[in-house]
A protein has these predicted regions:
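Generic enzyme active-site microenvironment
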Residues: 16
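Phosphate-/polyanion-interacting regions in eukaryotic proteins
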Residues: 170, 179-181, 192-196
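Short, well-ordered beta-to-alpha junction loops that form the rim of enzyme active sites
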Residues: 178-182, 220-223
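Extreme N-terminal starter segment of soluble prokaryotic enzymes
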Residues: 8-13
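Eukaryotic N-terminal low-complexity, Ser/Thr- and Lys/Arg-rich leader segments
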Residues: 1-4
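Extended, H/D-rich, highly charged conserved domains that either
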Residues: 189-192, 196-224
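Active-site nucleophile/metal-coordination loop of metallo-enzymes that catalyze phosphate/sulfate
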Residues: 21-173, 184-190
Length: 224
């Protein structure tokens, strides 16, 4: 965390190195990537170990060399999170390792809690089946966007769903609506043929209904 001039407005800038975890929480075995539990998750530690083992030699070589983050206490924090001591040089920054109290594995839960706002509820997740969305959600999308249907209506990746449904979207004008393992509904549409403002309006008007269901995010994904 970099802190601004406190004599000015007392603001703090919270900089998040996303997806670089330093160790799994005690309940990691309750969360999965496919069929694999998150037990033993430690992205940063595994990267450092791969570098030390000579398994990360493309474009670089040797042990992980991150002097600025190391000085701030990155290696100390990783060791603490995994019940080890760190014998390297003392850190010049203030460091620590925190255990999340929010149940969500998603981005908003983690970021909100880092900013001091834990999430004491369970997010809503759409099932990994087709159709993924209940009829009332599909109906709301169609009414707001003034369309007669939606495309995808399933769990999908961003690039794959555009490849699969992009041509049909351009031809039929129906928005591409999909979700993932996160608490999210993503809507992709062409910013000219569908309209950027129309897409943003759709997501903005749809969001209150989905937030009432405890869905974390409604994301607009315009494409060219």
């Amino acid at each position: 965390m970099a802190v601004s001039d406190q004599s000015a407005k007392g603001r703090a800038f919270l900089v998040v190195l996303d997806s670089v975890g330093i160790g799994g929480a005690p309940d990691a075995d309750q969360y999965f990537n496919g069929d694999l539990p998150d037990t033993g998750s430690n992205t940063f530690g595994h990267i450092a170990q791969a570098c030390a083992d000579g398994l990360a030699e493309e474009g670089r070589s040797g042990p992980l060399n991150i002097p600025n983050l190391a000085a701030l206490g990155m290696f100390h924090a990783e060791a603490l999170a995994n019940g080890r001591s760190f014998d390297g040089a003392p850190a010049t920054g203030t460091w620590g390792a925190a255990e999340e109290v929010s149940r969500g594995k998603d981005t908003p839960s983690g970021h909100w809690e880092l900013a001091g706002l834990p999430v004491p509820w369970d997010w809503h997740y759409f099932p990994d089946e087709t159709p993924a969305f209940p009829d009332e959600v599909t109906k709301a999308i169609c009414e707001i966007a003034n369309v007669d249907g939606i495309l995808s209506n399933s769990h999908a990746s961003g690039t794959g769903v555009i490849d699969e449904f992009g041509a049909a979207h351009m031809q039929m004008g129906q928005p591409i609506c999909y979700t993932s393992a996160d608490s999210v509904l993503q809507i992709a549409a062409h910013e000219k043929t569908f309209g950027l403002e129309r897409l943003l309006d759709l997501c903005e008007r749809l969001a209150p209904k989905l937030h009432a269901m405890k869905l974390g995010r409604v994301i607009a994904l315009p494409s060219k």
